[in-house]
Amino acid sequence: MIRTRIKICGIREGIHGLAAANAGADAIGFVFHKDSSRYVTPSAAANVAAVLPPFVTTVGLFVNATDRKIKDTLRAVRLDMLQFQGDEEPDFCASFGLPYLRAVRMEEGTDLLEWAGRFSSARALLTDTYVPGERGGTGKTFDWSVIPKDLPIPLILSGGLNSDNVGRAVREVKPWAVDVSSGVEASRGVKDPKKIVEFIRSVKREDAG
């Protein structure tokens, strides 16, 4: 059985990080973009990371942050991986000594094979729905049929996923991992532990057939 990995993004509190880990999440994401309702300070993220059990990957999400901003954040909080959600180029993404994910906003005409070629140093491409003025956490899905079946690097599917549609997403797309933020929230920026559990159960149920 192939197991779909799960990332819960936009974690701001230790109780929600633990809820995700205890339910079986493989990774949690911290949003270090101040324009986001899910923004977390590096010190608050460090407090969350400190209570996580082993083997839960911590991912830091950045949007067009400066080199200094990212390095200052890395000094403040232990991160296992970076996620770039803006207009960052491959050399910049690879310059911090950590593996990274490259987010791709799926607007009309987006060529994921071209992105995979440009960002061959990325551990995965993370697809998200294109909404003007927003960088992730849109709560909207996109047409999954445009995703190529022969991507040379792993795919993380994101964009409008929730416990009701993630099973179908796993079945149709067969991504390496799924990523969720707004789909497990009680209100914008506030995670709901019950929704986190329901989401992870839905993924595991689909994996089990």
Indicate residue ranges for each PLM-predicted region.
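Conserved N-terminal beta1-alpha1 strand-loop-helix module at the mouth
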Residues: 1-209
